[in-house]
């Protein structure tokens, strides 16, 4: 059963939380390892990420707690320099330090409880996610009025200067600037960006998580950065180029003769060709040309594996298995590599079969339980309503939907509201405001609350069952439905069938 983070917060910090925030993770569709080489990238923010529950403190200290690092307990500090023993807390500390060094002051401290729906080892940018989340918390609570781009830049400074992680700006921008149902076409050299509609037609992106993280990813990443810089320094002595991604493809043969070894040339070869693949993907997505996009994805993996040497045996195996599955037209590793995850482009008709087959075959081949899930392009970091506020509105909206759909009468409003509260283990809730949202969105709020509070298990099966339980509040007993059906059928069998269809549709049964 899922724990109640709301209850945990009170037990850990001794008070109720006042604010709730969310920041998405990100996945890069294409453009790997060229952000720090001044290239273009095509990331999306995804519908998984990190949440923060926050309350104000009476002193100026900041206290951090992460459900992912429960054993570390509360990390309370007013010293925001890097400290190895502070672990995950160095990410929010670095953001705070970056803000302080820019002249921003914080008149009071905060208690911040982090919990995540993404694995740190998945390669979905959990570090940048917690940075942007922290910056969003500070921006909102202290009313700093910083733009999304400014937040991204401050987070990148925190990561590069205070955490000494030399990377491009992609991760922070992909998260902070995210727009729902759009990909971000980002120029890492000019710092320009453009939104393009994320519409894959009959296809979806499935994340294929190897669950085999590398213990040396940071050192290997830094080595690639150094190799690229060394190659660029040599090339600059002979060609007027500013970054590796600006090298024309026709120069590659001449450049191969300039570089002292084949390894450096292969690094340059990947960077130059990956930039070309991003530009082709950009045009393909705008034209809804999925086949061309798929070709770029596949070629990207080959280059990352053979030229940039950042793949792994598990990544190669998961990509190989994915490409052999019916409905999958492309797959590649994504992220820094050396472990982490891949992405697959899969036809919607084969999603269930794909995930089931991949889970079995990957385990059979590696002995590792992988994880396979679809992702969609979501919006950026934001403040969320407190659980009870959004819940009361959802209940009010659901009851109003039932009245409008003629499932219940106006006189049944209080009775049905109380029945729903009983299923949620609540005796009372403040009266909410109904909103004309789609039924699935209303139900999602109620069902996710039940999972969050440990009322139901956080599984698709348990959520589906609870969906049916809630909607049954509005449905007459089977005996009453049968009587009504036979009564109508005496006049018209067609109308009797319409009655069954309409009540099934309105009650979310079909």
Regions picked out by a protein language model, each given a short descriptive name:
Residues 38-45, 224-225:
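Short Gly/aromatic-enriched secondary-structure transition segments
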């Amino acid at each position: 059963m899922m724990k109640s983070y709301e209850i945990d917060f009170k037990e850990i910090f001794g008070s109720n939380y006042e604010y709730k925030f969310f920041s998405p993770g990100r996945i890069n569709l294409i453009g790997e390892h060229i952000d720090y080489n001044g290239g273009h990238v095509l990331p999306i923010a995804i519908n998984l990420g990190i949440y923060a529950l926050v309350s104000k403190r009476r002193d100026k200290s900041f206290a951090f707690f992460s459900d992912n690092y429960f054993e570390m307990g509360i990390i309370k500090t007013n010293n925001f320099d890097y400290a190895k023993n502070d672990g995950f807390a160095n990410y929010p500390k670095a953001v705070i330090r970056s803000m302080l060094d820019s002249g921003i002051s914080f008149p009071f401290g905060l208690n911040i409880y982090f919990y995540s729906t993404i694995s740190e080892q998945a390669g979905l940018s959990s570090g940048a996610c917690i940075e942007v989340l922290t910056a969003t918390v500070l921006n909102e609570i202290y009313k700093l009025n910083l733009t999304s781009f400014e937040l991204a830049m401050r987070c990148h400074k925190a990561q590069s200067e205070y955490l000494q992680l030399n990377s491009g700006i992609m991760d922070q921008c992909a998260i902070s600037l995210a727009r729902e149902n759009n990909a971000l076409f980002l120029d890492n050299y000019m710092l320009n960006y453009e939104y393009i509609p994320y519409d894959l037609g009959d296809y979806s992106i499935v994340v294929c998580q190897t669950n085999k993280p590398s213990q040396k990813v940071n050192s290997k990443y830094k080595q690639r950065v150094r190799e690229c810089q060394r190659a660029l320094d040599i090339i600059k002595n002979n060609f007027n180029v500013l970054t590796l991604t600006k090298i024309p493809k026709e120069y590659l043969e001449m450049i191969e003769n300039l570089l002292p070894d084949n390894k450096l040339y292969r690094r340059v070869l990947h960077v130059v060709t990956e930039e070309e693949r991003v530009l082709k993907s950009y045009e393909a997505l705008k034209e809804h040309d999925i086949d061309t996009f798929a070709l770029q994805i596949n070629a990207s993996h080959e280059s990352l594996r053979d030229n940039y040497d950042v793949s792994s045996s598990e990544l190669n195996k998961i990509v190989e298995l994915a490409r052999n599955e019916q409905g999958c037209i492309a797959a590649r590793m994504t992220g820094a590599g050396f472990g982490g995850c891949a992405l697959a482009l899969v036809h919607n008709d084969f999603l269930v079969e794909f995930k089931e087959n991949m889970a079995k075959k990957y385990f059979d081949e590696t002995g590792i339980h992988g994880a396979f899930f679809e992702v969609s392009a979501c919006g950026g970091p934001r403040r969320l309503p407190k659980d009870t506020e959004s819940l009361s509105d959802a209940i009010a909206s659901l009851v109003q939907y039932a009245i409008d759909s003629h499932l219940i009468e106006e006189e049944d409003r209080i009775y049905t509201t109380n029945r729903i509260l009983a299923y949620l283990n609540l005796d009372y809730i403040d009266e909410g405001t109904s909103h004309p949202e789609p039924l699935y969105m209303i139900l999602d709020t109620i069902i996710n609350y039940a999972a969050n509070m440990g009322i139901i298990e956080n599984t698709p099966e348990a959520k589906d069952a609870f969906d049916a339980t809630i909607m049954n509040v509005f449905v007459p007993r089977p005996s009453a439905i049968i009587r009504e059906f036979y009564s109508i059928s005496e006049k018209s069998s067609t109308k009797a069938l319409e009655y069954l269809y309409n009540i099934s549709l309105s009650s979310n049964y079909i």
